[in-house]
Regions:
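Generic detector of intrinsically disordered, low-complexity, polar/charged segments
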Residues: 32, 52-54, 85, 125
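Short, glycine/charged-enriched secondary-structure capping and boundary segments
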Residues: 83-84, 97
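Active-site scaffold of zinc-dependent metalloenzymes
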Residues: 39-80, 87-93
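Short, well-structured alpha-helical patches and their helix-loop capping segments
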Residues: 75, 79, 83, 127-134
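Metalloprotease/metallohydrolase-associated module, dominated by Zn2+-dependent proteases
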Residues: 1-36, 96-163
Length: 163
């Protein structure tokens, strides 16, 4: 088993997928596990790009909660994937040390979300290639396993190797 497989397996065992699949229930479980609420904020792709986001979403970490900002024009399925990608970063421990200085929001995003006292704005540039690959595989596999029939909630086994 590779290091990535082990990390992904641990992340999904930590917060099992709800059955039947429900993104809001999963986000609530992730929030409970982390002790930090998670809220979702759709914004224009232009605002995301202004913050240096080459993808379609960012994770805004505040002192006691997290906000996932995503492309408002994304289809439902694509928005879910973007959200799960950011959750992957959270569960895989990709975030910065919250004691480090905050990364500022762009002026437009800060104006749209004035109540955000961001500790960190975490976009694709923050995680490196390996972190981005892990989060992408996490989102892909979560979406696959979320659609599989099953009797109980569970995490996924990457490529079924750890049977």
């Amino acid at each position: 088993m590779t290091s990535m497989e082990a990390r992904l397996g641990e992340a999904t065992r930590t917060v099992p997928l709800p059955a039947p699949w429900d993104l809001n229930a999963y986000l609530a479980a992730v929030a409970a596990h982390r002790g930090r609420s998670i809220s979702l904020r759709p914004v224009s792709a232009a605002m995301l790009a202004e913050d240096g986001c080459r993808g379609k979403g960012l994770w805004v970490a505040r002192g006691h909660d997290d906000i996932i900002v995503y492309d408002a024009d994304a289809t439902d399925r694509n928005a879910e994937h973007i959200i799960l990608h950011e959750v992957g970063h959270m569960l895989l421990g990709h975030g910065k040390d919250l004691a480090e200085p905050a990364t500022p929001l762009s002026p437009k995003l800060a104006a749209l979300l004035p109540s955000l006292a961001a500790q960190h704005v975490l976009g694709r540039n923050e995680f490196g290639v390996e972190g981005e690959q892990e989060a992408e595989v996490f989102a892909d596999m979560t979406m696959v396993y979320a659609t599989l029939p099953r009797r109980t909630a569970r995490g996924f086994r990457l490529f079924r190797r750890d049977r």
